[in-house]
Regions:
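Repeat-unit-sized solenoid/scaffold elements
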Residues: 1, 9, 55, 59, ...
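Small-residue-rich hydrophobic transmembrane alpha-helices
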Residues: 1-59, 65, 102-116, 120-121
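Residue-level detector of solvent-exposed, low-hydrophobicity positions
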Residues: 8, 23, 137, 150-151
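Short runs within selected transmembrane alpha-helices of multi-pass transporters and secretion channels
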Residues: 16-19, 94-114, 120-132, 136, ...
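Short alpha-helical transmembrane segments in multi-pass integral membrane proteins
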Residues: 26-97, 140-169
Length: 169
């Protein structure tokens, strides 16, 4: 996880940049008295940009996994055999979930908080971890003894519930 955690942090830099920009743009327009419809339109535009950035980052990571990570990065950490396959599997799951992560970061830390809806941002952040990710991960790993890919997907499952709830809000 230490390696994938660093790759994740590096990969989400652009997402947090868009999120910060979204907070400034949305907060400024609200402060200027923009209509609710205009704020929604701006928010959707920013969310689509963040989704696009998530897809671009996913594509870049998908290209880096077989060309840089597996042959050069992972051996620096003496990963081979099973540990190499687990690290690669974790990276693949992260690549698949990256667009939802980008969307969620912008929606929660950018748009909802800038709009003053910190309660919903808190519920989405904390609730999705403790009511979705932790139980799914515990069940897949401890009860069902599922493969690593499914356990990793359980860890990332919070994104699957944040997107529809965030859009609804």
């Amino acid at each position: 996880y230490a390696i994938m955690g660093n790759i994740e942090k590096f990969s989400t830099v652009a997402c947090y940049g868009i999120s910060g920009a979204a907070a400034v743009i949305v907060g400024k327009r609200i402060g200027e008295g923009a209509s609710k419809e205009e704020i929604y339109d701006i928010s959707w535009c920013l969310l689509l940009v963040s989704l696009l950035i998530g897809v671009i980052v996913s594509a870049a990571l998908a290209a880096l996994l077989p060309t840089i990570f597996i042959p050069y990065l992972y051996p620096l950490f003496h990963l081979e055999g099973l540990s190499l396959r687990i690290a690669a599997t974790m990276c693949v799951v992260f690549i698949i979930m990256m667009p939802t992560k980008a969307f969620d970061i912008t929606n929660i830390t950018g748009i909802l908080r800038a709009g003053g809806d910190v309660r919903m941002a808190f519920v989405l952040d904390v609730g999705s971890v403790w009511l979705v990710s932790v139980p799914i991960t515990a069940l897949t790993a401890l009860v069902f003894d599922a493969p690593v890919a499914l356990v990793c997907l359980g860890i990332q499952a919070e994104g699957l519930c944040k997107v529809p709830l965030g859009v609804w809000r």
